Regions:
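Charge-dense, low-complexity intrinsically disordered segments
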Residues: 75-78, 96, 185-188
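Condensing-enzyme catalytic core mediating Claisen C-C bond formation in acyl metabolism
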Residues: 103-104, 133-200
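Short acidic, glycine/serine/threonine-rich loops at helix termini
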Residues: 58-63, 114-117, 183-184
Length: 216
């Protein structure tokens, strides 16, 4: 949300002077794709891709509300948590998932790590379901804590990758898909773009996918 915030990031990673620096808007996924293309075209042999989010620089729920349609949605100030609540309610009413399944996700997360906010862990699903709603049907444990974070990945072309690592992980392809952001224009309980990407990536054999990370 802050103009030219990438400049401080370049200072942090020590790229002085940066040999070949490029920055993209939106998220690090686009930066990853740009670096991937540069490797494929032979412009570079290696690339450091990084992305970061600094939610503490502003009021995140207000910022995200201002990214919605300025005529029909933004005047209502629906923040991301409220819209996630709409999506959760649609899924519950349609029988796509249950409140117990939602609580199980939170319980599994608590078993792996503590949260960065004041939300306390629980020992059972019933304990979580007894907690009050924050944005019905969401409780605080259903909502990701607002935090600052960063991620990075090093890409290398074929021979260079084998030189740097005995068993490197390979990127086999990318799929670009998008769905309308207009509230009410699509079914919030399904994601056609995710389904189409999975089919394209596997040649239609989606059952071969062992692990998938899906985020929004």
């Amino acid at each position: 949300g802050r103009a030219f915030s990438f400049i401080s990031a370049i200072d942090s990673i020590g790229a002085v002077p940066p040999i070949n620096e490029s920055h993209v808007e939106m998220d690090a996924a686009w930066a990853l794709y740009e670096a991937y293309i540069k490797l494929l075209t032979g412009q570079v042999e290696t690339a450091l891709v990084y992305g970061f989010g600094k939610s503490s620089a502003g009021t995140l729920r207000r910022v995200l509300a201002m990214q919605t349609d300025p005529y029909t949605v933004a005047p209502l100030w629906p923040d991301a948590v409220s819209m996630a609540g709409l999506q959760a309610r649609f899924g519950l009413d349609a029988g796509k998932w249950t409140a117990e399944q939602m609580a199980q996700v939170a319980l599994d997360s608590f078993a792996v790590a503590e949260r960065t906010d004041s939300e306390k862990p629980a020992k059972s699903i019933d304990e979580l379901l007894a907690r009050p709603y924050f944005a019905d049907p969401l409780r605080r444990h259903d909502i990701a804590p607002i935090t600052d974070g960063a991620s990075a990945i090093v890409l290398a072309a074929g021979d260079k990758a084998r030189e740097l690592r005995e068993n490197p992980a390979w990127i086999t392809g990318f799929e670009h898909r998008i769905e309308t952001p207009v509230l009410g224009a699509r079914d919030l309980t399904v994601s056609p773009s995710t389904e189409a990407s999975a089919k394209a990536a596997t040649g239609g054999d989606v059952g071969s996918i062992e692990v998938a990370e899906i985020y929004a």
